[in-house]
C-alpha cells in the first residue's frame, strides 16, 4: 500500500503496532502494519513482517521484581502495582486541558473536543496494597533541590508532561530551555522548591542515527550509550527511562569496532529481530549508569517505565481505530507487548545485581511495571482527537487516529502515582504502617 506523510501525525517521533489477539511463532513479521508507523515518519512505503521470536503469554497479574525497597529502610515487602483492577473514581483528575499549558496539542483530548468524559474517572487499585492519589506537595518535597530527568521517546515526554501538569497544580514550572525541534529537549525550573525538570529525546537510549530521506532504516550502536543525555548523568538525581516503540522500526545494529551484528527488516543483512537488541541496549544503558553513578557517590534513583501497549483495532486512518470508552475488565498481556515488558523487567533485575556488586548503596533502580494496567486502558488514547474537533464536518473518508499516546489528563497520570509511591516507600514513609 502506498503511503504518504502527514504533518499532523502522532507518530512523527513514535512508532506503534496493531495486531491480532493471538500471535503465533514467526508471524509477527508477517502480520503487523508497519505502514502505520512509517506513514507518519517518512514519505516512503513498504510492507513489513516482524516475527514473534519469543512467543508466550503473560497475564496482567504478572509480578515485577519484589525488591523495591532497600533493606536499610526496614521494609521487607513492596507493592505489586501490576496486579490490580481499574475502579471508578468520581474525584476526577487534578488538572484539565485548560489549566495546564505543557500538554502537547495532540494529547489535549478535552480541548480538542472529545465528548465522553468517563475515561477520566478511573483509578488503579492494586490487589494487595494501597496506591494513594497523587499528592503534588509530597512529590515536590521529595524532589526538592533535585534534578529529575525523563529520557526516551515521545511516551517519555507524555509521562513527563503528565507529571508537570500535576506538580503545576501547586507550583507552576518555568520553561528555561527548548531546542526548538518539536520540543524534543526541554528544561524547566520550579523556583518554590528549587527543582529542575528535563526531557531528553533519545528513542534508543544508546547511540543511534535516526532514519532519514537517504536511509529508510535506523542505525544503532549497541555498545555505546547516547551521550546527549548520559553526559549529564552526574547532575541528575531522579532518572526515568521510557523507550521501546522505536525498536520496532527497521534498523541495522552495530556492536564494537563498527561490527554489524544484523538487522531488523532491511535488505542484505541477517535478520535478528529486536527483542535481544532491546535487551542489549538496556544492558549498555544500565551498565553506564552504574559505572558513572558509582563514581560520584550521590544518592540517585533510576526507573524504567515498561512497554506501553498500543490499541489499534483497525487501520490507523479509519473511523473507530481506537474507539473504546471504558476500560477492559480483563485482558491478557501477550506476544510482543509481553516480551518487551519481560525484557525491560529482566534488565532492571540484572542492573540491581550490578549495583550490589559495585557496592553503591546510594543508587536505587526499579521498573515501573505499567504494561498490564496500560493494556486495559484502550479508552485512554486520543484516537481521532489528536486533531481538534475531527468530526465537525461529519466523518470523513480518512480519520487519523493516535492509539499509542495517552490523553492528558488520563491513564498515564497513574504512572506518576506509582512513581511517587515508590519514592515514598524508599524514603521510609510507610515504615511501620500497614500498606
Task: Provide a role label for each language-model segment.
Residues 2-435:
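A compositional signature for long Ser/Thr(±Pro)-rich, low-complexity
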Amino acid at each position: 500500500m502506498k503511503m504518504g506523510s502527514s504533518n499532523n501525525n502522532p507518530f512523527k517521533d513514535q512508532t506503534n503496532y496493531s495486531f491480532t489477539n493471538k500471535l503465533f511463532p514467526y508471524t509477527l513479521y508477517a502480520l503487523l502494519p508497519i505502514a502505520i508507523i512509517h506513514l507518519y515518519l517518512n514519505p516512503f512505503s513498504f510492507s513489513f513482517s516482524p516475527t514473534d521470536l519469543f512467543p508466550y503469554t503473560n497475564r496482567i497479574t504478572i509480578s515485577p521484581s519484589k525488591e523495591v525497597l532497600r533493606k536499610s529502610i526496614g521494609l521487607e515487602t513492596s507493592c505489586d502495582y501490576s496486579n490490580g483492577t481499574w475502579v471508578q473514581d468520581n474525584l476526577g483528575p487534578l488538572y484539565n486541558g485548560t489549566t495546564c499549558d505543557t500538554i502537547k496539542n495532540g494529547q489535549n483530548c478535552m480541548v480538542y473536543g472529545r465528548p465522553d468524559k468517563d475515561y477520566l474517572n478511573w483509578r488503579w487499585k492494586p490487589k494487595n496494597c494501597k496506591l494513594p492519589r497523587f499528592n503534588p506537595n509530597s512529590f515536590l518535597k521529595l524532589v526538592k533541590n533535585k534534578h529529575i530527568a525523563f529520557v526516551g521517546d515521545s511516551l517519555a515526554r507524555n509521562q513527563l508532561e503528565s507529571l508537570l501538569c500535576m506538580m503545576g497544580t501547586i507550583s507552576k514550572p518555568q520553561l528555561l530551555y527548548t531546542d526548538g525541534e518539536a520540543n524534543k529537549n526541554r528544561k524547566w525550573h520550579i523556583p518554590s522548591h528549587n527543582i529542575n525538570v528535563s526531557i531528553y529525546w533519545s528513542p534508543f537510549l544508546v547511540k543511534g542515527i535516526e532514519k532519514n530521506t537517504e536511509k529508510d532504516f535506523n542505525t544503532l550502536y549497541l555498545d555505546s550509550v547516547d551521550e546527549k543525555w548520559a553526559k549529564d548523568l552526574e547532575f541528575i538525581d531522579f532518572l526515568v527511562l521510557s523507550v521501546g516503540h522505536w525498536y520496532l522500526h527497521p534498523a541495522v545494529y552495530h556492536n564494537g569496532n563498527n561490527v554489524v551484528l544484523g538487522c531488523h527488516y532491511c535488505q542484505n543483512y541477517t535478520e535478528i529481530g529486536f527483542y535481544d537488541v532491546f535487551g542489549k541496549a538496556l544492558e549498555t544503558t544500565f551498565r553506564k549508569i552504574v559505572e558513572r553513578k558509582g563514581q560520584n557517590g550521590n544518592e540517585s534513583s533510576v526507573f524504567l517505565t515498561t512497554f506501553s501497549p498500543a490499541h489499534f483495532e483497525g487501520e490507523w486512518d479509519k473511523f473507530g481505530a481506537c474507539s473504546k470508552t471504558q476500560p477492559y475488565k480483563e485482558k491478557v498481556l501477550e506476544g510482543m507487548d509481553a516480551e518487551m515488558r519481560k525484557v525491560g523487567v529482566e534488565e532492571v533485575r540484572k542492573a540491581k545485581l550490578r549495583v550490589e556488586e559495585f557496592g553503591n548503596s546510594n543508587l536505587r533502580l526499579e521498573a515501573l511495571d505499567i504494561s498490564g494496567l496500560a493494556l486495559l486502558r484502550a479508552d485512554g488514547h486520543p484516537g481521532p482527537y489528536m486533531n481538534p474537533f475531527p468530526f465537525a464536518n461529519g466523518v470523513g473518508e480518512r480519520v487519523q487516529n493516535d492509539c499509542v499516546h495517552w490523553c492528558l489528563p488520563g491513564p498515564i497520570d497513574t504512572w506518576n502515582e506509582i512513581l511517587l509511591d515508590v519514592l515514598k516507600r524508599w524514603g521510609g514513609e510507610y515504615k511501620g504502617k500497614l500498606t
